């Protein structure tokens, strides 16, 4: 089975930077172990990408915390994932969900798609919904143990919402 594993926004600013959380830091070793096991999966990473004008954008006005400003350190994918990034497609995205992501994944002819990453309640759920719409007949799942939300409550709420939309939560 051709499985695509989508790794959402595992970037320094979401781990221990401007928007970092203990949950994200705690999840990272589980994600590394998963990637070490998933040797047959085709990897696609997303990378939240903002410019110096972030605070002037719609997102910046609603979340006035500069983060993932290219090419600052906070924008970089976590160092522990660098060996996996070398084997992956990387999609930079200027907002929560990526309309480019389904185009990249379509070229991989997926038979299953699994998502992991940060933040469950923002970018993971946004991309899960986009992928569900783009690939209605492809099983889509989320590994909850390799995700973290802004808060534990919002993480759980996002998982419940994805389940309601027929995204399998494991």
Predicted regions and their residues:
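Active-site acidic carboxylates
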Residues: 1-90, 156, 160-163
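A structural signal for isolated positions on well-ordered beta-strands in alpha/beta enzyme cores
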Residues: 4, 42-44, 112-114, 139-141
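Short, well-ordered secondary-structure micro-motifs
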Residues: 18, 55-57, 101-103, 126-128, ...
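Histidine-anchored nucleotide/phosphate-binding helix
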Residues: 32-36, 125-135
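Short, catalytically relevant binding-site loops at active-site mouths
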Residues: 50-52, 74, 96-99, 147-149
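Internal catalytic-core helix/loop-beta-alpha segment
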Residues: 71-122
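A short glycine-rich beta-strand->turn/loop micro-motif centered on a GG-aromatic cluster
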Residues: 114-118, 138-150, 170
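Structured adenosyl-cofactor binding patch, chiefly the S-adenosyl-L-methionine
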Residues: 147-159
């Amino acid at each position: 089975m051709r499985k695509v594993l989508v790794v959402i926004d595992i970037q320094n600013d979401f781990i221990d930077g401007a928007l970092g959380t203990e949950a994200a830091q705690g999840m990272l070793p589980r994600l590394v172990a998963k990637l070490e096991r998933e040797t047959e999966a085709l990897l696609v990473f997303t990378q939240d990408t903002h410019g110096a004008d972030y605070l002037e954008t719609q997102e910046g006005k609603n979340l006035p915390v500069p983060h993932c400003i290219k090419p600052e350190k906070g924008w970089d994918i976590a160092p522990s994932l660098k060996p996996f990034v070398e084997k992956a497609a990387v999609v930079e995205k200027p907002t929560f969900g990526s309309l480019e992501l389904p185009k990249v994944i379509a070229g991989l002819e997926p038979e299953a798609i699994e998502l992991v990453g940060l933040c469950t309640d923002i970018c993971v759920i946004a991309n899960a919904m986009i992928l569900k719409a783009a690939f209605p007949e492809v099983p889509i799942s989320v590994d909850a143990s390799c995700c973290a939300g802004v808060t534990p409550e919002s993480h759980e709420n996002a998982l419940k919402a994805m389940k309601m939309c027929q995204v399998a939560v494991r």
